[in-house]
């Protein structure tokens, strides 16, 4: 059941929109939801520290959707048009997308899901003594990992999968504080055909933007791939009249390999520039690993794995 956090009822009287809901799940995690934003939040620490951290997360979430809505038109513009934002989460989106804009078409909306997670996590852990914490927004995850700690994040071989079929272990020393997954059949539209591209980066917003762009480039021209204009599927899409993937038919192993190689080149470019820490690219059970992250992979349903230079699910 959804209820308000202790000491702060969700009501119009304290400036909180009536649609904002919050409550503790049976396992002690915090659930925050407002409109399309649905967060699952967990942390490890002393009970009083966790209570305060969760209250701070609630405060950080309150009003965030409304601030984004006010900036939506600007944040839907390409980075090259120099979009502006009046809120912190919008600034995170712009900063994340700007890292990739020199060679790629990208709007700040590419980082919206986990810019929200980054923002809530930042507020949540401020002045709090927690060993580990995370904010999961639809499988894209912002992480807080104290020195000497590590976290395990569930990952999926297809973005629409409901249950993780693999896991990656992330230590504090790696510097990865964000995990994001993108693919053609997920809730966001894609220009490519990747089943899943999972990226580790220094922030969740950077991981989200990078995963989107790498997944776009896992692609090839083929009659089995169906596409449509983005704005014909979603009115006002930030992708405009770009062709997005709507269906992927049967491909040979060589064709899948060709598509993965294209995305791998983009991932390597991002790795070399320092924009990401590593990436896992999957299509039809073939996988490519970019960066020194093979040791992080606990398991995954893939074959023909190669290494150069999520929907996430569970987090432990």
Tell me the role of every PLM-derived stretch.
Residues 27, 36-38, 148, 194:
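A general secondary-structure signal for short beta-strands and their flanking turns/coil
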Residues 2-11, 17-20, 47-136, 202-289, ...:
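Alpha/propeptide regions of enzymes that mature by internal proteolysis
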Residues 46, 148-149, 158, 293-296:
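A short, sequence-level motif marking secondary-structure junctions
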């Amino acid at each position: 059941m959804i209820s308000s956090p202790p000491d702060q009822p969700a009501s119009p009287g304290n400036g909180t929109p009536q649609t904002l809901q919050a409550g503790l799940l049976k396992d002690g995690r915090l659930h925050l939801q407002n409109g399309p934003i649905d967060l699952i939040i967990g942390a490890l620490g002393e009970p009083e520290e966790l209570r305060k951290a969760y209250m701070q997360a609630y405060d950080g979430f309150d009003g965030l959707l409304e601030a984004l809505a006010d900036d939506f038109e600007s944040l839907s513009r390409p980075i090259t048009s120099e979009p502006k934002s009046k809120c912190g989460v919008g600034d995170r989106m712009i900063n994340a997308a700007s890292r990739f804009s020199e060679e790629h078409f990208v709007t700040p909306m590419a980082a919206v899901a986990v810019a929200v997670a980054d923002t809530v996590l930042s507020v949540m852990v401020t002045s709090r003594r927690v060993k580990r914490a995370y904010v999961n927004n639809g499988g894209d995850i912002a992480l807080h990992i104290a020195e000497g700690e590590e976290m395990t994040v569930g990952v999926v071989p297809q973005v629409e999968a409901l249950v993780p079929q693999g896991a990656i272990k992330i230590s504090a020393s790696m510097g990865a504080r964000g995990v994001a997954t993108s693919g053609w059949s997920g809730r966001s539209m894609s220009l490519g055909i990747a089943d899943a591209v999972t990226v580790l980066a220094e922030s969740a917003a950077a991981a989200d933007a990078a995963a989107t762009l790498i997944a776009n480039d896992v692609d090839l021209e083929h009659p089995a791939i169906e596409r449509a204009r983005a704005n014909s599927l979603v009115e006002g899409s930030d992708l405009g009249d770009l062709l997005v993937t709507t269906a992927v038919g049967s491909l040979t192993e060589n064709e899948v390999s060709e598509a993965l190689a294209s995305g791998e080149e983009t991932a390597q470019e991002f790795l070399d520039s320092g924009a990401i820490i590593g990436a896992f690219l999957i299509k039809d059970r073939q996988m490519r690993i970019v960066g020194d992250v093979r040791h992080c992979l606990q398991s995954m349903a893939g074959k023909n794995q190669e290494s150069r230079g999520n929907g996430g699910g569970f987090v432990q």
